[in-house]
Amino acid sequence: MRCLGLMSGTSADGVDAVLADFRGSPNHPQWDLIRHVHHPYPEALRHRVVSAGQGEPSRADQWLDLAEAITEAQAMAARSCDPHAEAVLVGCHGQTIWHRPPTSQQRGASWQLLQAPLLAQLLERPVVHDFRAADLALGGQGAPLVPKADAALLGGTKGWRALLNLGGIANLTLIPPCCGPDRDASVQGWDCGPANSLIDLAVQQFSNGTLLFDRGGAMAKAGHSDETSIRRWLQEPYFQSPPPKSTGRELFGRANLQQRLNDLGRDCSSQDAVATLTSFSAAVVAQDLEQLMQRDRIRPLELIVAGGGRHNPVLMDQLQQRCRGLQLSSSQEMGLPVEAREALVFALLAWWHQRKHPGNSPSITGATRESVLGVLVHPG
């Protein structure tokens, strides 16, 4: 069955689209990646999405306009990826505006901006959307949803495999081996903390908006990181909390960046600040892997990296230095382009919805039970 997956993440740089074919068992599907594209958001739309994700107030009509613009961008990405309308089903995550994990005092909630009926009408195909809602209703975090799909798509190794996505947020998946004493262990996964979110915001601020990200790690390469600040930041509650946990720009956005820049002090150059934030993103992942070893005695054989951060050589070098003894590789080496992984996941989640197969993992999200994810809408 050919499905189209659409994903726009916390980096808010555009829409990743994947056309894939799935067949066989839902637990261990056979799959082929047919085509993938990246459709950039126009600068004005990107700015509106980032501002909305910082909690900046807008009028009701502005929210409607933004939802429509996001939906039209998703449709353009879909048409570009699937020009001959081969897909019979579309899985669309939408654009996360706000994510609130549950607490002991408050139910969890998550808002992905999208007009799904409009998207179904524009593409003339059924659309599965609102993937987080069912897990949240069952007391879960609603995220991350990628790990269970990762295990289905990329499992089958003799040792623990770690997959790291470096988007706006860094998230880890730990896939158990297919044999040996850990073969019946559960998939693990969580959001580590910021990957590109703080780096991108800092570069945009220091360049007065002329740069959107640290291309080639140039600014970080020209600076020196403040290891004292990094060690202090790693003691913050989120980084010391065990999974399940999920986060986004609500926690690691402009306000958080400003706090860290204030902490670094006025004498810190822009290059040193970006170098520190880049090293911090790597240190967050390294600390999580070390805590995993101490907590569960799990040490993965390899760390497979995907997402836009894979193209930042300074970030990758910092990961290699801080994750000693761990072999780093790219998802590209497994036939999965680094920008395509999450869009492929939402194509799979749409297929799972059609097959009535649960898409969440309670051991990851904290939900009370498994559930089929997503809401299906048909074109009128």
Swiss-Prot record:
GO MF, one annotated term: phosphotransferase activity, alcohol group as acceptor
Alphabetical UniProt keywords: ATP-binding, Carbohydrate metabolism, Kinase, Nucleotide-binding, Transferase
Top-level lineage group: Bacteria
Enzyme Commission code(s) on record: 2.7.1.170
GO biological process: 1,6-anhydro-N-acetyl-beta-muramic acid catabolic process; amino sugar metabolic process; peptidoglycan turnover
Reactions mediated catalytically: 1,6-anhydro-N-acetyl-beta-muramate + ATP + H2O = N-acetyl-D-muramate 6-phosphate + ADP + H(+)
Any Pfam family hit: AnmK
Pathway: Amino-sugar metabolism; 1,6-anhydro-N-acetylmuramate degradation; Cell wall biogenesis; peptidoglycan recycling
Residues holding ATP: 9-16
Keyword Protein biosynthesis recorded: no
Family of the protein in this entry: Belongs to the anhydro-N-acetylmuramic acid kinase family.
Function: Catalyzes the specific phosphorylation of 1,6-anhydro-N-acetylmuramic acid (anhMurNAc) with the simultaneous cleavage of the 1,6-anhydro ring, generating MurNAc-6-P. Is required for the utilization of anhMurNAc either imported from the medium or derived from its own cell wall murein, and thus plays a role in cell wall recycling.
HAMAP family tied to this protein: AnhMurNAc_kinase
Family matches, as PANTHER family: ANHYDRO-N-ACETYLMURAMIC ACID KINASE
Descriptive protein name: Anhydro-N-acetylmuramic acid kinase
